Amino acid sequence: MVKRKGASSSEEGWNYEAKVAEIEGIITRIEAGELELEAVFEQFASAVEYLRQCESFLQQRQQQVDLLIETLSEE
């Protein structure tokens, strides 16, 4: 199995759906105006990091799918 890049994404228990839910929660709080300006910046930075982790995860899965499709084509 391929390891995920990034410190947070390689930890045990990392979950794509959970990160997407966290990103959605951050967006909701920012849009609702529930946060002070400093917290907005902190939450935005967290959301960007989660998005990077998710993108890396999806890229790795796409590579795995491409490899599987390639092996099917060879058979």
Curated annotation (Swiss-Prot):
Primary location class: cytoplasm
Family, as annotated: Belongs to the XseB family.
Protein function: Bidirectionally degrades single-stranded DNA into large acid-insoluble oligonucleotides, which are then degraded further into small acid-soluble oligonucleotides.
UniProt subunit comment: Heterooligomer composed of large and small subunits.
EC number annotated for this UniProt entry: 3.1.11.6
Enzyme class: hydrolase
Signal sequence coordinates: none
Keyword field contains Transit peptide: no
Localization annotation: Cytoplasm
Record-level GO BP terms: DNA catabolic process
UniProt name for this protein: Exodeoxyribonuclease 7 small subunit
Stored Pfam families: Exonuc_VII_S
Gene Ontology molecular function: exodeoxyribonuclease VII activity
InterPro entries xref list: Exonuc_VII_S (IPR003761), Exonuc_VII_ssu_sf (IPR037004)
Annotated keywords: Cytoplasm, Exonuclease, Hydrolase, Nuclease
